[in-house]
């Protein structure tokens, strides 16, 4: 990996968001309690699939619910592949949805290479750090509907460029 140009790497992963995300800390005047509202019901999970390169976020897609092979294949085929250039290296973690031969075939047909991270090593993927920053922005937005959550994700992604 030492001989690889970092500009060729595209890290792809997914993260979950929901409509009850709120800031974890608050401020208040001395002697007063910090107050905030948090819904009791988390609502359905909205999964964000995104790719990160040295130039910033490559492409993103949201879907209600979790990620399986079919959802990941749609993301790769309709969102990631149009944004890739031949010769780029797509780096993913070892989730089962990333491993089918169809995913590898799609990426290699575009002239790119698919590489898997070692098991249990999310700290090797910089997209995890980007998701942490995105989630901080989404918590501050306090989106309580799916439409508001999608809008907050779009704004957060635009700030990450």
Task: Describe every region a protein language model picked out.
Residues 1-161:
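Short functional hotspots at interaction and active-site rims
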